[in-house]
């Protein structure tokens, strides 16, 4: 009787579900946007980092992993992963970096590349809902990035620049942002 009464009560309960939550996740952790500031670790990026560039050229994945661990220990919420260097196979290195980082850290990752093939390879192997860095107001960028974000899920960082570069006026930047949002909506993003 007791269990039957519980079942009847349970049927009457309506689950609470939040709508329109923006979040990214790893296989174990979720980071929700809109509540508190989000810290994104940007050290896994060769721009201006001679030692990091050498590590990439030498296929030194341990260097990347140490950077990831150090940033996690410092308290970042999301880890940006950028291995773009002309001298290496970015697609192969990004795939390796994403897979290896996921094996040792529990932070959500931000896939940071303008190489569509590398982006898709990384997103396909990512265990969670990734952040993609980035799309911009150029039609070519939106036509490349949005289908991948739609296919694999995730959030996307939008940069307010277009074929003419970065506008000087705030109104022009807002116009680009609106164009990006309109295009994203076509993909259900």
Question: Model regions: which residues?
Answer:
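Domain-level signal for soluble alpha/beta catalytic cores
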Residues: 1-189
């Amino acid at each position: 009787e007791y269990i039957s009464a519980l079942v009847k009560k349970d049927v009457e309960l309506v689950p609470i579900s939040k709508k329109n939550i923006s979040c990214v996740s790893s296989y174990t952790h979720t980071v929700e946007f809109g509540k508190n500031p989000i810290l994104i670790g940007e050290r896994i990026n060769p721009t201006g980092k001679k030692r990091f560039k050498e590590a990439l050229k030498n296929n030194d994945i341990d260097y990347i992993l140490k950077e990831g661990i150090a940033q996690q220990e410092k308290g970042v919420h999301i880890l940006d992963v950028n291995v773009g260097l002309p001298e290496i196979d970015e697609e192969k290195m990004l795939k390796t970096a994403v897979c290896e980082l996921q094996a040792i850290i529990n932070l959500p990752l931000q896939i940071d590349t303008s190489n569509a093939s590398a982006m898709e390879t990384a997103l396909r192997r990512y265990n969670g809902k990734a952040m993609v860095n980035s799309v911009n107001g150029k039609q070519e960028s939106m036509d490349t990035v949005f289908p991948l974000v739609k296919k694999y899920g995730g959030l996307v960082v939008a940069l307010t620049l277009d074929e003419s570069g970065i506008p000087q006026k705030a109104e022009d930047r807002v116009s680009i942002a609106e164009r990006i949002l309109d295009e994203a909506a076509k993909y259900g993003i």
